[in-house]
């Protein structure tokens, strides 16, 4: 059991026997009213999204999900097939099931993912917090007034755009924090 004030992104709740993922949680306390938690939830079985408000002391059922290591095997249209690294079982997910990690998914990636299961059914995939990707396009840095941290847009192999440091060039590998889509530095790859 969790209370409303303990909710944070990544928490999974059982509401009407369905697993709901907390995607965003914002705690608000005003002087007149009691504290509340505004949340954005996603149903892991149907993909339906909703916004809900909970009181700070509301009691909620949390769910423990099963997790297994997996790798991306192949992509076919909007279908992504992952393979369990221990028993080589294949699992398939649609693009809308993995929309949070879709910007980092690309054919031939070597990252070990976590396949997330609810009652034996694959409902989502989570990537490591840091991944390495190759920059395929970026502009040359502007010379001159560059005091502080200067960033510029860069495009990755799968088309995702990210802000990188001005010294990054085309074909370099960079490390990306998947939690907030931020540039961490050059990759040691």
From Swiss-Prot:
Biological pathway: Protein biosynthesis; polypeptide chain elongation
InterPro entries hit by this protein: Elong-fact-P_C, NA-bd_OB-fold, Rib_uL2_dom2, Transl_elong_fac_P/YeiP, Transl_elong_KOW-like, Transl_elong_P/YeiP_cen, Transl_elongation_fac_P, Translation_prot_SH3-like_sf
Keywords assigned by UniProt, alphabetized: Cytoplasm, Elongation factor, Protein biosynthesis
Single GO MF annotation: translation elongation factor activity
Pfam families per UniProt: EFP, EFP_N, Elong-fact-P_C
GO biological process: one example: peptide biosynthetic process
Top-level division of the source organism's lineage: Bacteria
GO-annotated cellular components: cytoplasm
Location in or out of the cell: Cytoplasm
Family: Belongs to the elongation factor P family.
Role noted for this protein: Involved in peptide bond synthesis. Stimulates efficient translation and peptide-bond synthesis on native or reconstituted 70S ribosomes in vitro. Probably functions indirectly by altering the affinity of the ribosome for aminoacyl-tRNA, thus increasing their reactivity as acceptors for peptidyl transferase.
NCBIfam families: efp, PRK00529.1
The name this protein goes by in its record: Elongation factor P
Upper lineage: Bacteria, Pseudomonadati, Pseudomonadota, Gammaproteobacteria, Pseudomonadales
